[in-house]
Design a protein with these regions (language model features):
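Extended substrate/RNA-proximal surfaces in nucleic-acid metabolism proteins
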Residues: 2-21, 65-170, 217
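Charged helix-capping and loop-helix junction motifs
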Residues: 41, 156-162, 185-192
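Active-site neighborhood of phospho(di)ester-bond hydrolases with catalytic His/Asp-centered motifs
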Residues: 24-26, 54-59, 86-89, 145-148, ...
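Acidic-and-aromatic substrate-binding clefts and catalytic sites of carbohydrate-active enzymes
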Residues: 33-36, 60-64, 151-156, 179-186
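Divalent metal-dependent hydrolysis catalytic cores, especially in the metallo-beta-lactamase
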Residues: 43-64, 84-86, 142-145
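Short acidic/histidine-rich active-site segments
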Residues: 201-217
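Active-site beta-loop-alpha junctions enriched in small/polar residues
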Residues: 29-31, 59, 88-94, 107, ...
């Protein structure tokens, strides 16, 4: 599926500073990588808090996706209102000589192009290059998103520009760089990142990057 026609695109086009953590969360973790919650505990919490759309983005693992999808189907069959879950994974990559993280969203979890990234550890060699990561995500039918652009040793403007040149679909605009107990996006830096992404015609996402027991905290 071409990224321009991806069904998640229309959702991400509505993301704003107030979308996270109550409505959307496209960046969080479970015990399948370095998070603290079991996958089913996370999806139950997301459902009980009224989230409408989310993706769990464990590092180099999509193992949490199917168990959560199975639980959501059970709940829908019982007539419950539950969130829409998109496949997700956080992948390490080298961009402009800097180690960055790329969020893969809405891809086919078993696709062969992502096998090298879906084994629990970062890839090596050519597969670690950002262009290789982006192409693999697209080959698997997903969207490639630059995670937390303001967290790296290279400035966010250079990284966003480089990502755009490589065909990335977007960047994580709304993020808590102060890592507060309760998630809140960081003024100034998030607004600047959002403007740059918007000016380049890129999608903007949001997420708590939760690794703990509370989806609304870091």
């Amino acid at each position: 599926m071409p990224a321009d026609h991806h069904p998640l695109r229309s959702v991400l086009e509505t993301v704003g500073p107030e979308s996270c953590p109550g409505q959307f969360n496209f960046h969080c973790h479970t015990l399948c990588s370095d998070g603290s919650l079991e996958p089913l505990a996370l999806i139950r919490q997301a459902s009980s808090r009224g989230l409408t759309q989310l993706a769990v983005t464990d590092h180099h693992s999509s193992a949490s996706f199917q168990p959560m999808q199975d639980w959501l189907k059970q709940q829908r069959d019982l007539g419950e209102t539950v969130p829409i879950l998109w496949s997700g994974m956080e992948i390490s990559a080298i961009l402009r000589g800097c180690l960055v993280h790329v969020l893969a969203l809405g891809f086919e979890p078993a696709h062969k192009s992502l096998a090298v990234y879906n084994q629990g550890d970062a890839a090596v060699g050519e597969a670690l290059r950002a262009e290789s990561v982006c192409q693999a995500i697209h080959d698997a039918g997903g969207l490639a998103i630059l995670a937390h652009p303001g967290r790296y040793r290279v400035g966010f403007a250079d990284l966003i520009d480089a990502a755009a040149e490589l065909g990335f679909d977007g960047g994580e605009a709304w993020y808590d760089y102060d890592m507060q107990t309760r998630w809140s996006w960081s003024p100034v830096v998030c607004e600047a990142i959002d403007r740059r992404l918007k000016n380049l015609g890129l999608l903007r996402t949001c997420g708590t990057d939760s690794h703990g027991l509370d989806l609304e905290g870091r």
